C-alpha cells in the first residue's frame, strides 16, 4: 500500500444483547409489577387519545407520558425512561400499522392486555444500569438486583439499555443491550 492510501478510519460496531436471569426480592417484584402495569396503562391511554384525536380532527395528536402524571399520580413512582420508551413503542406500532408497503392495512395498533407479556425497557444514563461485582445489576428505581452473570461483556462495550421481563412461570430476566464505542483503525 502506498503511504497516501493509509489513514485512520472510524468503524461503528453493531449492538449486542446478553440476557441474564435475575432474582428480585419481594419489594423489587412489587416495583416490577407496578412498572409493568404503568407501562401498559400509559400505552393504552396514549393509544386511546391518538385514536380519538384522529377520529375527531383527522390528525394524530402528539401525546406524552407526562401528560397523564397529574391525573394518575402513581405514574410518578416508576421509572420515567420506561414510560418514555412506551411512547417510542407506540410510535413504532403506528408506523407499522399504517405502512403502505404492507399488502393490507391492519388499522390502529391493538391495546395491551393484562395477559400480555410483562416487560419494559429502560435506558442507561450515566451508569444508571450497571453490572456490579458480577453478582448484581443496578436498575433505575429498583436498585441492585441479584443476577446470574454467566457472560461478561468486554470493557469496550457500554450498556445502552436494559429490558426487564417476567415469564409466565414467574421468573424474571433482564436483557442488556450493549453498544461498542466506535473505534479508529489503521487502513
Regions found by a protein language model. Give the residues of each.
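Nucleic-acid substrate recognition interfaces
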Residues: 1-187
Amino acid at each position: 500500500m502506498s503511504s497516501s492510501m493509509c489513514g485512520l478510519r472510524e468503524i461503528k460496531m453493531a449492538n449486542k444483547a446478553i440476557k441474564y436471569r435475575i432474582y428480585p426480592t419481594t419489594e423489587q417484584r412489587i416495583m416490577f409489577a407496578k412498572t409493568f402495569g404503568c407501562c401498559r396503562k400509559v400505552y393504552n391511554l396514549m393509544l386511546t387519545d391518538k385514536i380519538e384525536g384522529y377520529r375527531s380532527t383527522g390528525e394524530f395528536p402528539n401525546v406524552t407520558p407526562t401528560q397523564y402524571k397529574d391525573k394518575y399520580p402513581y405514574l410518578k413512582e416508576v421509572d420515567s425512561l420506561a414510560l418514555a420508551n412506551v411512547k417510542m413503542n407506540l410510535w413504532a406500532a403506528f408506523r407499522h400499522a399504517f405502512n403502505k408497503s404492507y399488502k393490507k392495512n391492519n388499522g390502529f395498533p391493538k391495546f395491551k392486555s393484562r395477559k400480555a407479556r410483562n416487560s419494559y425497557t429502560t435506558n442507561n444514563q450515566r451508569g444508571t444500569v450497571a453490572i456490579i461485582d458480577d453478582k448484581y445489576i443496578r436498575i433505575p428505581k429498583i436498585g441492585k438486583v441479584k443476577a446470574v452473570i454467566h457472560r461478561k461483556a468486554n470493557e469496550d462495550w457500554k450498556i445502552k439499555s436494559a429490558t426487564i421481563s417476567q415469564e409466565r412461570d414467574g421468573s424474571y430476566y433482564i436483557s442488556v443491550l450493549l453498544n461498542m464505542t466506535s473505534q479508529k483503525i489503521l487502513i
